[in-house]
Amino acid sequence: MKKTIYKVLVSFYQYVGLGKKFHPSHDTVLIIGGSSNELGIELCETFIEDYHTKVINIDTIDSINGKNARRSEKLYTFISCKDFSDIKCLEESMLYLQNLEIIPTVLINNMQEGIESTLLKEDKFLRLDEESLNEFEKIVRYNLQSVILITKFCLSNIFPKVQAEAQEKAKGFYIVNISSVLTLKPCKSGTHFITSKCGINSFHDGITSELKLKDSNLNVKTLIAYLPSFESEAHWKRLSPSISKHLVHCLLEGRYGDTILESKRSIGDILLITGFKSSFT
């Protein structure tokens, strides 16, 4: 009984924010997909404009160009990746990242390739023809394969470098994976996108478990953030600023586990309570 209660309390303390917390002055944020979708753009601008935090953005296009965020050139660095489905392009981007003088301590995986397909009333690809398979392969390579490779690279090559060089205040790392609530319920459209995000859910669970078991000096906290469902592109654009602020607030609090963006509850809230109750039955 005591052992069970202890485990629940440890999980609770991790969840509410002990350990690593985002520090605007000491942390540098690496965003994967920071300018090819509305949320990425808002995240870049929120970190730079509101918190004066250094941001590294890896994406296919730099649509932050011309925005207010670009006024602070010292805070914003763009790394081009022409094609996230091409491993060679990813390797070139990672090499560029590794050679930068600034080193990220917070990694946000925000790949949202194919998210617009979830806005359709009916799935675009009802049959697995060649077009459907090609689209599926691209979405999975963008949203899942690239995230896995970049995360592994940061854990193996980037974070250890920070650990060795950074001051005590900057030690500790955050990995944030952005998924979708659509992975948690049946949906009639956007199946390719949703499948890729289901893969992200599994990868997040795996990397979290690996970091707990691995004999490493790295202090890495993980968080999976679920996007809400969107009714239209206008709805997605309208919610992105508040979603961005919600996510940053979670990092400031040192949230661990999971959170549903634009919601006061998380999956972790329910699981924690359920787990605590079941320990007495």
From Swiss-Prot:
GO terms under cellular component: mitochondrion
Regulation: induction: Expression is induced by the KAR4 transcription factor.
Cross-referenced SUPFAM superfamilies: NAD(P)-binding Rossmann-fold domains
Active-site residues from the entry: K197
Top-level division of the source organism's lineage: Eukaryota
Residues where NADP(+) binds: L39, T60, K67, K152, K197
A single MF term (Gene Ontology): oxidoreductase activity, acting on the CH-OH group of donors, NAD or NADP as acceptor
GO biological process, one term: deoxyribonucleoside triphosphate metabolic process
Protein name per the record: Oxidoreductase-like protein SRL4
Organism this protein belongs to: Saccharomyces cerevisiae (strain ATCC 204508 / S288c) (Baker's yeast)
Lineage, opening ranks: Eukaryota, Fungi, Dikarya, Ascomycota, Saccharomycotina
